[in-house]
Amino acid sequence: MQTLSSAPDPAVSIAVTILALLLALTGFGLWTAFGPKAAKLTDPWDDHDD
């Protein structure tokens, strides 16, 4: 049984690191898409005339 003072399993540390990275990237993507600077984004399909 692990106690709080013992070192965590390396697999758990790697899993938590990957999860934190994915959450950070998802948050950044949502902030970019819907945040204050989203008004400056343009749709390339609308800009292209056929």
UniProtKB/Swiss-Prot annotation:
Its main location: membrane. The chain crosses the membrane at residues 14-34. InterPro entries: PSII_PsbN. It is found in: Cellular thylakoid membrane. May play a role in photosystem I and II biogenesis. GO terms for biological process: photosynthesis. One of its GO terms (cellular component) is plasma membrane-derived thylakoid membrane. Keywords: Membrane, Thylakoid, Transmembrane, Transmembrane helix. It holds the Pfam family PsbN. Disulfide bonds: none annotated. Belongs to the PsbN family. The keyword 4Fe-4S does not apply. This is Protein PsbN. It is a single-pass membrane protein. The keyword Nucleus does not apply.
